[in-house]
């Protein structure tokens, strides 16, 4: 009778909800791991591992290295990927003034300086390695030694030897 019919509909409903749930979870995971990194690569901190590797390989040639802070707080990623000794960092870093949200960030440690790097601000600084966002560096008249790209092929960083 009626109860048998309700049992079948209940089972059907549970199975249907399970299928919808599995579909949505798989769709979410696909969007998160396939599309999101291609659409918003900066949010995944892409490029920093390669950037730090390159900068570490040439840092002995420069007394100062200027790194853009356009993508998050790069000092954390530089410390992590370069395996910088914590005891050295703790004794020599400089914090910025607190912003309107009462946050500060690291502006300097060792030979590294982290700040925005529009070309008019850094172009006259010589004997320095400059890591900038691509839109901050002019297309001509600049000694771009390396470009680091996001996975989607767009430039993430331009590295200039000044």
Give the label of every model feature segment.
Residues 92-162:
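Aromatic/acidic, Gly/Pro-rich catalytic loop(s) in extracytoplasmic/lumenal soluble domains
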Residues 13-59, 70-82, 86, 90-116, ...:
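Membrane-proximal, lumen/periplasm-facing interface regions of secretory-pathway glyco-
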Residues 4-7, 56-60:
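Residue-level signal for alpha-helix termini/capping positions
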Residues 1-16:
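Membrane-interface junctions at the ends of membrane-embedded or membrane-associated helices
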Residues 58-70, 113, 126-132:
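Short hydrophobic beta-strand segments
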């Amino acid at each position: 009778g009626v109860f048998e019919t309700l049992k079948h509909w209940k089972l059907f409903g549970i199975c249907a909800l399970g299928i919808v749930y599995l579909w949505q979870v798989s769709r979410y995971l696909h969007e998160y791991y396939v599309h999101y990194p291609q659409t918003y690569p900066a949010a995944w901190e892409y490029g920093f591992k390669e950037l730090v590797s390159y900068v570490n390989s040439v840092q002995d040639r420069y007394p100062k290295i200027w790194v853009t802070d356009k993508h998050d707080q790069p000092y954390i990623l530089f410390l992590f990927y370069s395996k910088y000794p914590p005891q050295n960092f703790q004794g020599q870093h400089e914090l910025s003034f607190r912003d309107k949200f009462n946050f500060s960030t690291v502006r300097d440690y060792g030979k590294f300086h982290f700040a925005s790097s529009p070309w008019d601000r850094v172009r006259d600084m010589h004997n320095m390695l400059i890591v900038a966002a691509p839109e901050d560096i002019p297309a001509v008249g600049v000694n771009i030694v390396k470009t680091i790209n996001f996975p989607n092929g767009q430039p993430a960083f331009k590295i200039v030897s000044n």
